[in-house]
Amino acid sequence: MHVRFRHLFLLPLITLVACSQPVSKNHLSLTSLSANAQQPVVNNAWLEISQGALDFNTKKMLTLLDNKSTLCAILKGDAYGHDLTLVTPVMLKNNVQCIGVASNQELKTVRDLGFTGQLIRVRSATLKEMQQAMAYDVEELIGDKTVAEQLNNIAKLNGKVLRIHLALNSAGMSRNGLEVSKARGLNDAKTIAGLKNLTIVGIMSHYPVEDASEIKADLARFQQQAKDVIAVTGLKREKIKLHVANTFATLAVPDSWLDMVRVGGVFYGDTIASTEYKRVMTFKSNIASLNNYPKGGTVGYDRTYTLKRDSLLANIPVGYADGYRRVFSNAGHVIIQGQRLPVLGKTSMNTVIVDVTDLKKVSLGDEVVLFGKQGNAEIQAEEIEDLSGALFTEMSILWGATNKRILVD
């Protein structure tokens, strides 16, 4: 409506009349809007994180180590996509003494959740990160002399002595460790050890392969190089933690435990070294709509699938925006009512289509499992990896970044 200047004197009357009109039943009241705003958001897809499975895996690992080596729980990558705020309390409950993360946000989150134990950053960090992280009482990973010298200066200016772990390249990652097989690397280690505002509390390396025979060879190399570093620097062995073992090495090569193990995937049931640990994550959605389509019809973008029979198709409101990638187009399966069912056509941004013709009875809202178990059926990590060409960890982190995580049991 266009209101001209000469009509402005009518505005008070118009307003009075409008305000006196009854509110239509078709409009939400302010009260109902407020109540609705306080309710949890209904999600199109979500990840269920099993507290019971996580607790089981943690206890099993602690029992395996039997106090022969310190357990450092690696919770980087937002606990591999499982939600750091959900996983950390389970570590606290089980009295885990060491946690390893990567980012400053993760450092802050772990401390805010009440963890007061040993906190290690398990990657190289920028100087800005490390300067801010002094507030979180973190032990930094250092494998570069120049970085060590600059961090030492920052620590001195702040009146602090920082604990660090010296990274060696003994396993051949060529990522962030000193090459102490050469004189230059040993000299760098000696220089770092002499910095007054840094204290070396650990010497570590990291394995690039999951092969027991290679790990044993790398372990022998690390032990010799660590011995050389201790000799040239004058460090006291009893004050240094030696640690190299990741999840695979911890389970497959007990000799690699040394003073501490750094395990991550095992907490979430993600390891090829053992089938005794439980999967923690399940990826779920619900059926949004059901439609019958005739034989010969096509499904999805680019008509990549042609129906071979009259079919009942279920619309699942999850797509590549939720981390269910296009690689699952015409290849993936989901589970509904305990049966594996095929994904038809290309995955859309927010939708996948599933053939439910063979189900005896199917209804709107039925639960859909995109990863994990339902009844006796299961979508396994190996299947996800084969179809996606990605590590399952890569997928779990992606799903965690794009979907609500809910703690169950």
Curated annotation (Swiss-Prot):
Cysteines engaged in disulfide bonds, as pairs: C72-C98
Keyword Signal tagged: yes
Example GO biological process: D-alanine biosynthetic process
GO MF terms, alphabetically ordered: alanine racemase activity; arginine racemase activity; lysine racemase activity; pyridoxal phosphate binding
Location in the cell: Periplasm
Main function: Amino-acid racemase able to utilize a broad range of substrates.
Protein name: Broad specificity amino-acid racemase
Upper classification of the organism: Bacteria, Pseudomonadati, Pseudomonadota, Gammaproteobacteria, Enterobacterales
